[in-house]
Design a protein with these regions (language model features):
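Charged helix-capping and loop-helix junction motifs
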Residues: 23-26, 49-56, 77-87, 112-113
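His/Asp/Glu-enriched short active-site or ligand-binding loop at hydrolase and phosphoryl-transfer sites
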Residues: 61-73
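Active-site environment of divalent metal-dependent phosphoester hydrolases
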Residues: 43-47, 71-74, 100-105
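Mid-to-C-terminal alpha-helical segments outside catalytic/metal-binding sites
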Residues: 109-130
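Extended substrate/RNA-proximal surfaces in nucleic-acid metabolism proteins
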Residues: 1-63
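Extended, charge-rich low-complexity interaction segments
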Residues: 10-11, 72-76
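Short acidic/histidine-rich active-site segments
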Residues: 91-107
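Active-site neighborhood of phospho(di)ester-bond hydrolases with catalytic His/Asp-centered motifs
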Residues: 37-39, 65-68, 93-97
Length: 130
């Protein structure tokens, strides 16, 4: 098992099907002294009509990592809205990227994207990112 930052485990869910046993997953990870870190929760479409699910993840012990590209609208308006909700409600613990190709990098460094990052993440956090 490869962990991040001591005992953090980066976790992902299916994009097509909501998890049936998220509580059990969290429990199993936590009792083994690992910290679950949910990657890009804003991108799971089944949560777009139920933002309470993000709070529930936090209650279950998950840390949340928002994808920077999500803030820009790269993955669509619903994903951007969810990402902004998570950040605006102080539910995000980390921001990251899902950088798979050059186009992702181009969007991340675009002037409009930088303005969005500054707006939603604040100057201090953005400067640490740069």
């Amino acid at each position: 098992l490869l962990t991040l930052i001591k005992n953090y485990i980066l976790t992902e869910l299916s994009y097509s099907t909501p998890p049936q046993k998220l509580e059990q997953i969290s429990f199993e990870i936590n009792i083994n002294n690992y910290q679950p870190l949910m990657a890009h929760p804003e991108r799971y479409p089944y949560y777009h009509k139920n933002y309470d699910a993000y709070t529930r993840m936090k209650e279950l012990g998950f840390l949340l990592q928002v994808n920077l590209l999500s803030l820009t609208g790269y993955y669509g308006k619903r994903v951007a809205k969810a990402a902004r909700f998570i950040i605006g409600n102080n539910l995000a613990d980390f921001v990251g990227t899902d950088l798979h190709h050059f186009n992702h990098l181009r969007v991340l460094t675009d002037t409009n994207s930088i303005k969005i990052f500054e707006k939603y993440l604040g100057d201090k956090l953005y400067n640490e990112f740069r």
